[in-house]
């Protein structure tokens, strides 16, 4: 949320100084009116895509403001990951998503959202679900109220969205869709 003071607009990516101290949050009458945040997505590009299963069964659709990563489990396994970045998390301790929707309709399938490197090696798992032999049934949406504490010791990360749909011949999916990711 931006904040306007003395006709000056202070964006979320800036700082407010009070008594020579840089604030990450600013309250007025005990109400939060400004909070420093960094937009990760939209903004950072798709740095790398890895198709790890049967090629036609993995798709990525990136509109710049909405990304969809989809694995289809047909006669072969659909599996792949997308690395968005790089971005620096130094100075931030939490991460939240603006409407990240993850769902699985297939058995032997997984979804994962992680922080890691350009090669897909994760450093910190944020979201993970494995259906095992159970047929799907996973459907969760994460919003701005779902905060994830991050380890910013490294500071230079990629956001990894990974989907894996088992070869069950059922033609079912594992999907991650996201509209935004922010550091606070």
Where would I find each of the regions flagged by the language model?
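Intrinsically disordered, compositionally biased repeat/linker segments
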Residues: 1-37
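Extracellular carbohydrate-recognition regions
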Residues: 34-59, 63
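Short beta-strands within extracellular/lumenal beta-sheet-rich domains
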Residues: 66-91, 141-148, 173-178
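Extended extracellular/luminal ectodomain segments enriched in beta-structured repeat modules
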Residues: 87-98, 154-158
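Short coil-to-beta strand junction motifs in C2/discoidin
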Residues: 106-111, 172-176
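Short, surface-exposed beta-strand/strand-loop-strand elements in extracellular ectodomains
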Residues: 109-120
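Extracellular carbohydrate recognition and processing domains
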Residues: 122-153
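Short beta-strand-plus-loop segments that form exposed binding edges in beta-rich domains
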Residues: 161-170
């Amino acid at each position: 949320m931006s904040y306007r003071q003395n006709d000056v607009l202070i964006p979320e990516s800036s700082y407010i100084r009070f008594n020579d101290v840089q604030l990450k949050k600013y309250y007025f009458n005990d109400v939060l009116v400004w909070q420093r945040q960094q937009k990760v997505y939209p903004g950072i590009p798709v740095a790398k895509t890895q198709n790890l299963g049967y090629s036609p069964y993995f798709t990525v659709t990136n509109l710049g403001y909405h990304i969809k990563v989809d694995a289809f489990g047909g006669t072969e396994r659909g599996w792949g990951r997308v690395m968005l970045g790089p971005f620096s998390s130094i100075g931030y301790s939490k991460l939240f998503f603006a409407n990240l929707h993850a769902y699985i309709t297939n058995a032997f399938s997984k979804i994962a959202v992680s922080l890691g490197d350009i090669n897909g090696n994760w450093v910190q798992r944020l979201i993970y679900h494995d259906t095992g032999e159970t047929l799907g049934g996973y459907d969760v949406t994460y919003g701005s109220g779902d905060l994830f504490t991050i380890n910013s010791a490294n500071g230079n990360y990629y956001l990894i969205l990974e989907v894996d749909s088992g070869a069950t011949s059922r033609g079912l999916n594992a999907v991650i869709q996201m509209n935004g990711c922010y550091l606070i």
